[in-house]
Amino acid sequence: KYAKVASLIEKRYNLHVKKLTKREIFEEGYGRRIFEIINETFAGLYGYSELTDKQIEQYIGMYFPMADLDLITLIEDWNADKKIVGVGITLPSLAKALQKCRRGRLTPFGWWHILRALKFGHTKIVDLLLVGILPEYRAKGANSLLFADLIPRYVERGYEWGETHVEMEANDKVQSQWQYLDCENHKRRRCYIKEIK
């Protein structure tokens, strides 16, 4: 389903998938542009505070060296001089690997479990860490390009489940993008307010 919609969107709006190299991230400024897109796409979400330049530099240096670039996808608008309009950053889940590390310790052998999860795919879960499309492209179905690129890669690597980041239950647009998948809501967070007199 995503592949059919993606091919239509690609032809109609001239949107295309872009895969990155380490050189593009660190030397050509794509790392910074990714987080600028995240700031723009998440700006209207409840509780989101914009990342500062210092935080962006820290995240680029901390996460991109270990990231599998095959699991990171950008969407470009070729009508707008290859402007980045969407981003999907995913990683193999480290939850089981961290549980196997004795109380989170990386030494003496905890690092091995994390390496296996990151590089050798010894996990069945992929974490969809940061997925966002610019507001003016959401109605055009640009997210279908992300999923049409990423889902076959997940299947090829043997991932069976995807874990998304926090989503508001009232955000119908985000909830509707999962309608074509066998999804299950298994975590729920609540915030309560009490006036102090």
Where are these regions (language model features)?
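Acyl-donor-binding surface of acyltransferase catalytic domains
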Residues: 1-21, 190-196
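A conserved beta-strand-loop-helix scaffold within acyl/acetyltransferase catalytic domains
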Residues: 18-133
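Generic, well-ordered alpha-helical scaffold segments in large soluble proteins
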Residues: 37-41, 59-62, 66, 149, ...
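Short proline/glycine-enriched turn/loop segments at secondary-structure junctions
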Residues: 117-119, 179-184
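Conserved acetyl-CoA-binding loop-helix of GNAT-fold acetyltransferases
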Residues: 125, 129-133, 138-154, 180
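Conserved GNAT acetyl-CoA-binding A-motif
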Residues: 125-126, 154-168
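Conserved beta-strand-loop-alpha-helix junction that forms the acyl-donor binding cleft
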Residues: 133-138, 164-174
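Conserved catalytic-core motifs of GNAT/GCN5-like acyltransferases
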Residues: 163-165, 182-196
